């Protein structure tokens, strides 16, 4: 077991990774709540769990320790009832509850459970019919609040452990998630990082207590000095500049360059890693749809300036920008779906660009994106194909479903 965080690249040998096994929360999605919960379809839980177990076993078979966030949270709350009560208070306040009949009823209900069951219930959500709470307000009896079946909504996106936090060097960002459906996920991370002995003294480059948003799918660690961050539907440019200032100023950080890549702001391309991932020292997957007809895309190189400020250089050529910040003479951009006008968007939608490198030139990715998989193999990449029929319904692939905690340095 490697304590703390050590992630200085996207491609170093993966030694430890944070996961969440899909649970009852997935079965609490309905057609009426799919959009609110950021899903386009409802996965079949039994098969999704089998697929996730296959994914986790693939990682273990290739030398990675699999760590489950729900187990870490259980360990933290079992160790300290005070921490558990503080977490529940924080959770309920963020859900809009204040001390009173419902708040007290939820607190009593959750604290009466064994800690493991409580953590599972936080992920699964608390239905209104689970508690005998007298409803006295009109909002409890009529209108949109009354139509909601839950006191606490489920967290079905939690198996995408990439986004609530991001390992970066020896530290981590704990992220202000864009949509309410995901915000409790990073609250769980906050309590784990602050209280689990495994992460004692781990620096937090940026916590979740901000008004501007960022998500881990937009945060890529290119090498020990350079990170790429997407300007996307889920991550704001203001956040990127503020994080760059922190990374440049903090003596525990080794980063001196941030590459900000602006991608289309839409659901299909919600994060940078849905359209661009690093798979070797000089090889990347890319979805060509992020560029305009002339092949241009807005790319910004941020470096330390005077008096704690940031200097910004604007380019419109992704390949040239990558060569510049990585000091490469050549690099290989491998197009999702081989750049075909039909195969590329189809396979990007099914996370063909969302690969997880487990070593230089060795990746894990969904089996369904066969055009991209064959092209990757032609380019010399070793590909571990994982099952995808149900997991992919949540709009995330192998990188989305994993948060590296420890990679070997290159």
Swiss-Prot record:
Keyword annotations for this protein, in alphabetical order, are:
Arginine metabolism, Cytoplasm, Hydrolase
Q: In which pathway does it act?
A: Amino-acid degradation; L-arginine degradation via ADI pathway; carbamoyl phosphate from L-arginine: step 1/2
Gene Ontology CC terms, in alphabetical order: cytoplasm
Q: Name one GO molecular function term.
A: arginine deiminase activity
Indicate where this protein is primarily found. Answer: cytoplasm
Gene Ontology biological process terms in this record = arginine catabolic process to ornithine; arginine deiminase pathway
Q: Where in the cell is it found?
A: Cytoplasm
InterPro entries reported in the protein's UniProt record = Arg_deiminase (IPR003876)
EC id = 3.5.3.6
The residues responsible for catalysis, as annotated, are 400 (amidino-cysteine intermediate)
| Enzyme class per UniProt | hydrolase
Q: Which Cys pairs does UniProt list as disulfide-bonded?
A: none
Top-rank lineage group of the source organism: Bacteria
| Pfam families membership | ADI
Question: Per the record's keyword annotation, is Amino-acid biosynthesis included, yes or no?
Answer: no
Catalyses which reaction(s): L-arginine + H2O = L-citrulline + NH4(+)
Into which family does the record put it? Belongs to the arginine deiminase family.
Protein name (database record)? Arginine deiminase
The upper taxonomy is:
Bacteria, Bacillati, Bacillota, Bacilli, Lactobacillales
